[in-house]
């Protein structure tokens, strides 16, 4: 029998100390990693609920375990809300992550050795879109497309020519570091012209799509995957949307193909997040996310740090640091100043991936805590001050104190 009163702090003080310090870090640091956000207390309550105890292999109404009548309700709510949010024909909410969602889609209609065509990781794509170090790049032949050197944007005419030449069985659209609107309608036309499937990974922009602030890929794609955190602001997890004709294949690939029991506590948290995303204020939040990213990009450009492609249409942008400082050095210096970013390769980067010539900046988390235009100006100048003097301890300490004071004005959880 376990204790009903013993706390983690009492039982495992070393772990509790790490948890406590991480909570403090989240409160005291400005979070600008584009893939991170703060889940609401309701999402975290669902994820920390008794649903974590329940095994439920199968799908609602078709389980391999008894006692699933209540978790069936939770999963059905998540599915129904996902369909309402995105207007899709079928939703699978069991994928443990976006990576597993992508893997399930690949294996549902492709065979090892088939060719896929995805955006190059070096140009803003994602590991799971065919990178050599990922299973997607090991199981399948890969033809990678990228952006134009002159403006950092996808060249759709070149993509069409490449697709005609390479004849992939599936085209993968979506990115992890691309700041412009993606023309899913055009990519859908390209895929159909060669008889290829279209998978859109909208993990980064799902919140924008849900609120109509980015064109939806759903009408144009055979499959759409996403994570449920990032701009959706839910728990860490995955979601697959697809046409009804692929529903059975996708479901079978998730279970029993790739996974066993679903994480019912996470699925419940997804249901909460989807309900939050259906509220009118969620669109206002997403509008502010975009406005903050555009404001921050302009402030930094005014200080001599231009964004790849010249700006942003969404929640993120890449700074090309050129010869001033490496991405690794910038990440470390900004971290010391209580500003969290990640080093990131820029298109046609001459530096290795562990060093890079750029950093990726995103505004979902900062916007969640209440930052607006005024805070973006203050933040942008702080970032530029550090980048201008990345080895100056006095500058870093001054910016750190300012960022900590700013964070205290806008607490995340209180």
From Swiss-Prot:
Pathway assignment reads: One-carbon metabolism; tetrahydrofolate interconversion; Amino-acid biosynthesis; glycine biosynthesis; glycine from L-serine: step 1/1
Which EC class heads this enzyme's classification?
transferase
Which reaction is the catalytic activity of this chain? (6R)-5,10-methylene-5,6,7,8-tetrahydrofolate + glycine + H2O = (6S)-5,6,7,8-tetrahydrofolate + L-serine
Q: Does the keyword Transmembrane apply?
A: no
Marked site positions, Plays an important role in substrate specificity: 229
Tell me where on the tree of life, at the top rank, the source sits.
Answer: Bacteria
Q: Which UniProt keywords apply?
A: Amino-acid biosynthesis, Cytoplasm, One-carbon metabolism, Pyridoxal phosphate, Transferase
* Record GO biological process: glycine biosynthetic process from serine; tetrahydrofolate interconversion
Q: What is its main location?
A: cytoplasm
Which InterPro entries does the annotation name? PyrdxlP-dep_Trfase, PyrdxlP-dep_Trfase_major, PyrdxlP-dep_Trfase_small, Ser_HO-MeTrfase, Ser_HO-MeTrfase-like, Ser_HO-MeTrfase_PLP_BS, SHMT-like_dom
Q: Which GO terms describe its cellular component?
A: cytosol
Q: Where does (6S)-5,6,7,8-tetrahydrofolate bind?
A: 121, 125-127
Q: Name the family.
A: Belongs to the SHMT family.
Family matches, as HAMAP family? SHMT
Role noted for this protein: Catalyzes the reversible interconversion of serine and glycine with tetrahydrofolate (THF) serving as the one-carbon carrier. This reaction serves as the major source of one-carbon groups required for the biosynthesis of purines, thymidylate, methionine, and other important biomolecules. Also exhibits THF-independent aldolase activity toward beta-hydroxyamino acids, producing glycine and aldehydes, via a retro-aldol mechanism.
Subunit structure, interactors included: Homodimer.
What name has this protein been given in UniProt?
Answer: Serine hydroxymethyltransferase
């Amino acid at each position: 029998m376990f204790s009903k009163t013993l706390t983690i702090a009492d039982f495992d003080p070393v772990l509790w100390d790490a948890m406590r310090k991480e909570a403090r870090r989240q409160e005291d640091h400005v979070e600008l990693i584009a893939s991170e956000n703060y889940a609401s207390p309701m999402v975290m309550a669902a994820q920390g609920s008794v649903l974590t105890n329940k095994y439920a292999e199968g799908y609602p109404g078709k389980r391999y375990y008894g006692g699933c009548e209540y978790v069936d309700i939770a999963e059905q709510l998540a599915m129904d809300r996902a369909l309402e949010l995105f207007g899709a024909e079928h939703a699978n909410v069991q994928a443990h992550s976006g990576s597993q969602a992508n893997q399930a889609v690949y294996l549902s209609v492709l065979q090892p050795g088939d060719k896929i065509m995805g955006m190059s990781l070096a140009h803003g794509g994602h590991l799971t879109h065919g990178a050599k170090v990922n299973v997607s790049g090991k199981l399948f032949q890969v033809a990678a497309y990228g952006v134009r050197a002159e403006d950092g944007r996808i060249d759709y005419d070149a993509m069409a020519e490449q697709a005609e030449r390479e004849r992939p069985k599936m085209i993968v659209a979506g990115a992890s570091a691309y700041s412009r609107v993606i023309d899913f309608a055009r990519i859908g036309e390209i895929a159909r012209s060669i008889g290829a499937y279209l998978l859109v990974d909208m993990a980064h922009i799902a919140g924008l799509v849900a609120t109509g602030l980015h064109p939806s890929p759903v009408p144009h794609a055979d499959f759409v995957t996403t994570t449920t955190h990032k701009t959706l602001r839910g728990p860490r997890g995955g979601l697959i949307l697809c046409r009804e004709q692929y529903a059975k294949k996708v479901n079978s690939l998730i279970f029993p193909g790739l996974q066993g029991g679903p994480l019912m506590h996470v699925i419940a948290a997804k249901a909460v997040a989807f309900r939050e995303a259906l509220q009118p204020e969620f669109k206002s939040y997403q509008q502010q996310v975009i406005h903050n990213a555009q404001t921050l990009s302009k402030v930094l450009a005014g200080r001599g740090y231009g964004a790849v492609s010249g700006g942003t249409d969404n929640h993120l942008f890449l700074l090309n640091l050129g010869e001033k400082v490496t991405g690794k050095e910038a990440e470390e210096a900004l971290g010391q100043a209580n500003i969290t970013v990640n080093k990131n390769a820029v298109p046609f980067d001459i530096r290795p991936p562990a060093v890079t010539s750029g950093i990726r900046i995103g505004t979902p988390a900062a916007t969640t805590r209440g930052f607006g235009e005024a805070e973006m100006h203050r933040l942008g100048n702080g970032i530029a001050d550090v980048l201008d003097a990345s080895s100056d301890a006095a500058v870093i300490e001054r910016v750190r104190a300012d960022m900590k004071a700013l964070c205290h004005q806008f607490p995340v959880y209180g």
